[in-house]
């Protein structure tokens, strides 16, 4: 489930990839040009797969809680940095797991052709994230029509897991759609606090 939770290129990395993909993947669902990457005040996102994400503005960044069936199953810790928004770590029922160093999720500014990548230690393994802005594309979702940046996100682990996803990102709002298996999960509703 989520941005990075689709097809795997290597079944050998399936176990390590599943947890890491779910953790990192949903973190990539929200995003903006720095002061406009995400809504400054936060907000509530409802997606067509039933996932609800609550983005809360906190000092120096955001907390992003993921709920399904009314229960929080994960919380991402995001912070502002010199280059954009970084994923510091993920809180799960079993504890908090940091990315060392934090991974750049979204740079201050998106432009077609832009590329960024990073490596980190996460849950006792090395992980790598690479993102390319493929262009701007019109996308229709239950929440409306948007001109969104199409991002290709590649995620790999040292245990052989690999995943590639597409997501559709609108600066100032966040991710309005993302690939899940063969289909597209769309934003149904966004509400500001």
Language model feature labels by segment:
Residues 1:
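Extracellular attachment/recognition segments
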Residues 23-32:
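Bacterial N-terminal signal peptides
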Residues 101-104:
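Short alpha-helix capping/helix-loop boundary micro-motifs
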């Amino acid at each position: 489930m989520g941005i990075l939770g689709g097809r795997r290129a290597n079944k050998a990395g399936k176990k390590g990839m599943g947890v890491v993909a779910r953790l990192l993947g949903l973190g990539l669902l929200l995003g903006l040009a720095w002061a406009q990457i995400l809504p400054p005040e936060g907000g509530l996102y409802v997606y067509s797969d039933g996932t609800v994400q609550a983005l809360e503005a906190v000092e120096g960044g955001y907390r992003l809680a993921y709920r399904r069936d009314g229960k929080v199953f994960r919380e991402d810790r995001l912070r502002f940095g010199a280059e954009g928004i970084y994923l510091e770590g993920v809180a799960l029922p079993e504890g908090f797991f940091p990315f060392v160093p934090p991974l750049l999720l979204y740079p201050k500014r998106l432009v077609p052709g832009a590329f960024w990548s990073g490596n980190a230690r996460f849950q006792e393994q090395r992980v790598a994230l690479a993102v390319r802005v493929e262009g701007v594309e019109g996308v229709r979702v239950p929440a409306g029509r948007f001109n969104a940046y199409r991002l290709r996100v590649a995620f790999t682990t040292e245990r052989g897991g690999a995943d590639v996803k597409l997501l559709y990102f609108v600066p100032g709002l966040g991710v309005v759609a993302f690939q899940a298996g063969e289909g597209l999960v769309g934003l149904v509703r966004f509400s500001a606090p």
